[in-house]
Each structure stands twice: as C-alpha cells, then as structure tokens.
Amino acid sequence: MYKCIYFLFLVVCVTFLSACGSNEEKQEEAGNPVSVVDFTGKTVSLSKPAKRIVALAPHLVENAYSAGAGHLLVGAVKFSDFPEAAKKLPIVGGYQKTNHESIVELKPDLVLAWESGNSHSSVELLRDLGLNIYVNQANTLVDVAKSIRDIGALAGTEEVAEKTASSYLTIIENVRNKYKDSELVTSFYQVWNSPLQTISGNHIISNAIELCGGKNIYADELAIAPIVNMESVVTRNPEAIIASGMSAARPEWLDQWKDWNSLTAVKKNNLFFVNPDHIQRHTVRLLDGINRICTQLELARARR
C-alpha cells in the first residue's frame, strides 16, 4: 500500500512540476492581501500574491515548484538543479554568498531565505533594502509541508500547495505506522569524514531515521551537526552506518569504516549510502531518501 500511495504521489508531483515549470496553467490574478508567519516567527505580509520570487537555497526552489509557484521564480542560487526547469533560472550567487545587487535588479516581491544557510547579515541587508523576506528552517519532516503551504499562500497557489503537502504528510504517516513497532536499529549518520561529523536528534535527517525505526546514536547531542571522534563511535557501536556525502556518487570514505571491524555495522556489512539530494534537501524528495533508509534498516534487521 505504501508503494502504491508513494507512486501516486510522484505522479501528482510530476504533473504539478511540469505544469508549473512550463507555465501552462494560468494563475488567477488575485489582488487580495496574503500573510503567513515564517519559521522565525515573523509575519510576512504582501498586499497581493507574489508574482516575482527569488529563492536563496536549492531546496526552496524545489518547494516553490511543489507549491505550484515555480513559474513565478525569477532568480535562484547555484546548485538549484531540480526540477529541470530550475536550471534555466538566473543565478544570484550561492546560498552562503548571494549577490545583493543581482537580487534587487530582479525586482522580486518575495525572497525565500534559509535561516541556517544564508548569512543573517545578508538576509537583514535585503530586508533593509525593502524586500519582503520569508525565512525557512525545516527541522522536522512536518516542517516541509509548512514550507510548501506557506509558499503557496504567498504566491496565491494554495490549491496546488495543499494537495502536495497533504499527499506528502499522508505518506509520512503511513511510513510511521508501518515501522512504529519495529525493533530499533542503532544508526550512525555520517555527514562528513574529516572532521568526522554527524547529526543530533534535532536534525531533520534524524527525524527520517527514527521514522524508519532507527535510533540515532547521537540524538542526545546539543549541537545540530556535532563533530565526534572515532573512539566515541566505536563505544556506541551502531548497527548501521549511513552516509550521503556531497554528490550522487557513493563517497569512498564510507568504505574506510571497514578498517574498524569491531563495529557491528562493519561485521554485518551495514554500510549504506543515500543520495544527498534525497535526504539533505528539505523537500518532498525526502520521501525517496526515507524509502531508501527504511529499506536499508530492514536489511540490517534481517542480518541480525
């Protein structure tokens, strides 16, 4: 049933993304004021739905398309490569270093910013220049749905946004119900190899691991992406090690764990890879990453 619902969701998403990317569906010219509260608690108010949007993170570009507002994007940052139409957008720098002049020249009536990715000073400068800023920070799987709904509200594409968000949440809930009684698999998620970096329980990826019946061995850390040492990992002895790296290719450093043959994850060959675009971007494509992690943790259970 999960695969069936997931397939239908993908069909819906592809339909929306294609329609919005090619601008085949004309949006109603509404002039009513719109307002949402962003992830920092600030109220973002527009006199009418946005018609020119700049997104300052790749995942916000994706979420705009998922919300039915892809055709309203006039600017994006480097690595905004999904869906295909996003590759044609004017680039205003990288998410860590944006070109303020380029953004202003695009005359956006809405800028989508990323709290933990864009510098605070950069966002505040754009705000001081009179631009409307919506700040996003998805820390949980449910937050992705809020992001899509908020963008839909600000762009006047609520119907598409609601369908996408609701379908996404339905699948999340189905996965939760499927694995809620499963035996926990202690898991280590590797963000990077040097220094050795992982995630705490406050990270959205930890949320995804828990959804699949995994237990993040560093869930109790205060920092959201703590640096840890090898001795600590060995002591906590995870059953599974999951990594994604920086590209769609499996990172070579995942195999370096084979030198630590005292680890259960190594003994059982539970060294798993997930495409970073499917787990590190806070979009509906998290469902692909979740599906893969759930499959991997099921394999780890079977190898006990």
Protein language model features and the residues they cover:
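Bacterial Sec-exported substrate-binding components of ABC uptake systems
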Residues: 2-6, 19-59, 158-188, 237-240, ...
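Bacterial N-terminal signal peptides
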Residues: 7-16
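Short helix-initiation/N-cap motifs at beta->coil->alpha
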Residues: 37-41, 90-101, 221-230
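Extracytoplasmic substrate-binding proteins
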Residues: 42-43, 109-110, 120-197, 218-220, ...
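A short, structured surface patch at a secondary-structure boundary
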Residues: 52-106, 110-115, 217
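Short secondary-structure boundary segments
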Residues: 57, 115-116, 191, 221, ...
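His/Asp/Glu-enriched short active-site or ligand-binding loop at hydrolase and phosphoryl-transfer sites
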Residues: 77, 202-225, 273
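Short helices/loops that flank or line small-molecule/ion binding pockets
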Residues: 100-107, 129, 228-237
